[in-house]
Amino acid sequence: MNDPSARRVRFSGLGSLPGVDFRAAVAMTFDKVPGLPYLPELPARGPWVGMVGRGLGLLVGLDVELLAGEWRLGVPGIDHRRSRATWRDDVDRLEELAQGYAGAFKVSVAGPWTLAAATGVAHT
């Protein structure tokens, strides 16, 4: 381990931030966490952009809906489409805001156990 960069400690953020201003949140992550900026979540923009909504929006082949504050599998809903659309929009805006940045970058997404625990099954 003679490579000094291999011993360097990095830190980053978890993802969720208050507010609804995506541009300001991204700028803050680049400013405050320059070693490993991250794609922020802004759950105040709606449930489809929080940790669970974002993760479910990335699933392919599984339909979900949000009903009375609970995500449910098996039914295609507008919130699932919103989650996917917001993800695409966030990544596009991130690309614009990160022009010229060439370092490491963190994107965190809820894993399968978190999504399973936060999702119910629609009863038909």
How would you name each of these model-derived features?
Residues 1-123:
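Alpha/beta catalytic barrel-like cores
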